[in-house]
Each structure stands twice: as structure tokens, then as C-alpha cells.
């Protein structure tokens, strides 16, 4: 068993060279290889469940491991990346490890090209895992994550059309890529719930009943017109929450 007891304890998000911020000019920020390890417990994992991890950003390159299994790499530095942990995760203790490399001169492995924005004259180089990390547990019929770079999935997309500014109304559209990783055909409804800025329910609506064969992936949609909306204007912003769910 690997002994990481003497490693520095940190919380995420974390830039290993964060203490250099505003003390050094950006071209002097430390660039090197840094490792992260996280031990976590999965108390119970059912046969119909899947587990995903999402990193919102690892700079510049990240190599990812779960329980000693190499999951893959990501070289962009500013985009999110995720992995399906299901094949290698287990009930009880698990450990995920990440090797990060924020070399100023980093070149992409496949093309040997540099990233133009990874430049001493442009972008402060805060290395490590400087963005959030999320762990998801889903059913084996699930809405995918917007992590196309590694998982080739597009996730959930919400947008508005048919704006009536004076009437304070618009049509809200939601669509989700849904995948059936079970061994049977499944039927479900796509439900959308919209909450106002105070968390109060504004509207719930559903799309048509959907049938998804085993192994099939499909984009499902639903839309509805909402009234009494708060539109953004100069000096005024208003955030709604949209939740999407699959209902048997």
C-alpha cells in the first residue's frame, strides 16, 4: 500500500503555486509535476448504478488513475474532463490519483504543438487542480455529462426562444442526451422543473414518453412557455434554476 501520510493535505480547488499569486510576475510562477491522491469510500454500489468523475480543469496536462488503473489523460488545461469509473470502482475504499504538469513549454503529445494561450505573456499559470471536482452516481439509464473530450457525451442543454419582452414571456427548451447502459429496453418520461431565484417552483413540464433500447443513446427534449419572467438588463441580473429528470 502506498504511503501518502506525509503528503500535504489540501482542499479542492487547489493551485499548488497559489502562494506565489501577486508576489511574482506570471512568467516566474513555478511550473512542475505535482501529484494528488484522494481516498474515498463507496458504502454500497448496486448492479444498476454507474459512477463518473468530472474535473472542471487540470492544468496543463492531467493523467488520471483509479485504484491503480490508468483512466486516461487530458491536455487542454482549461476545459472539463471526465471518466466512467464504473469498471474499476469497488465498494469500500477507493483511491483516485492525478498527475498534473503545468510546464510553460508543454506540447501536446499527439501533435507536438503548443497551446497558444499557455504563454508567459498572457495567462497566469496556476497549476494543479484549480477548479472543482465532482463525483456522480447514476442509474444505468442516465443523462450524460457535457464532457465530449473524453466521454464523447454532450449532456444537458437549456435555452430560450420566442422572447416577448413586454409580455415577460418566452419558450424554454431543455434537451438531454440519454444513454441506456442496461440490458433491457426502458421507457421513461423527460421531466423539466424550473425554479425562480428564491427556489420557488415556477413550472414543471414533460416531453413525450421515450423508449430506449439496450445500448442506445438518444437526445430527448421538452419545452414550455413561461410567463412573468425577469429578463436581464443593464445592472440587473436574475438567475433561474432548471432541473431535468428521467421518470418511469
Task: State each model region's role.
Residues 71-72, 76, 202-214:
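Solvent-exposed serine/threonine-rich low-complexity stretches and specific carbohydrate-binding patches
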Residues 228-248:
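Terminal connector regions
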Residues 91-92, 169, 213-217:
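Solvent-exposed, conformationally flexible loop/turn segments
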Residues 31-152, 196-197, 239:
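Accessory beta-strand-rich segments of carbohydrate-active enzymes
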Residues 142-181:
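Surface beta-strand/loop "capping" patches
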Residues 66, 167-210, 220:
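Beta-strand-rich binding/interaction modules
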Residues 36-38, 79-83, 208, 216-224:
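Short strand-edge motifs at loop-to-beta-strand transitions and within beta-strands
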Amino acid at each position: 500500500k502506498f504511503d501518502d501520510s506525509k503528503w500535504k493535505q489540501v482542499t479542492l480547488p487547489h493551485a499548488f503555486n497559489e502562494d506565489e499569486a501577486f508576489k511574482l510576475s506570471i512568467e516566474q510562477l513555478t511550473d512542475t509535476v505535482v501529484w494528488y491522491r484522494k481516498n474515498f469510500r463507496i458504502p454500497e454500489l448496486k448492479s444498476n448504478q454507474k459512477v463518473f468523475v468530472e474535473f472542471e480543469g487540470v492544468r496543463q496536462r492531467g493523467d488520471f488513475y483509479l485504484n491503480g488503473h490508468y483512466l486516461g489523460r487530458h491536455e487542454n488545461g482549461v476545459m472539463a474532463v471526465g471518466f466512467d469509473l464504473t469498471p474499476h470502482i469497488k465498494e469500500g475504499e477507493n483511491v483516485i490519483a492525478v498527475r498534473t504538469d503545468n510546464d510553460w513549454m508543454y506540447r501536446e503529445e499527439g501533435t507536438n504543438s503548443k497551446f497558444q494561450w499557455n504563454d508567459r505573456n498572457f495567462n497566469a499559470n496556476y497549476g494543479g487542480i484549480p477548479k472543482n471536482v465532482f463525483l456522480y452516481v447514476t442509474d444505468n439509464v442516465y443523462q450524460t455529462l457535457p464532457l465530449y473530450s473524453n466521454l464523447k457525451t454532450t449532456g444537458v442543454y437549456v435555452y430560450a426562444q420566442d422572447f416577448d419582452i413586454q409580455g415577460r414571456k418566452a419558450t424554454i427548451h431543455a434537451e438531454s442526451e440519454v444513454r441506456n447502459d442496461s440490458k433491457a429496453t426502458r421507457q421513461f418520461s423527460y421531466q423539466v422543473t424550473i425554479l425562480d431565484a428564491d427556489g420557488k417552483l415556477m413550472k414543471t413540464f414533460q416531453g413525450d414518453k421515450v423508449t430506449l433500447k439496450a445500448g442506445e443513446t438518444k437526445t430527448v427534449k421538452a419545452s414550455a412557455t413561461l410567463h412573468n419572467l425577469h429578463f436581464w438588463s443593464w445592472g440587473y441580473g436574475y438567475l433561474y434554476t432548471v432541473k431535468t429528470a428521467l421518470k418511469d
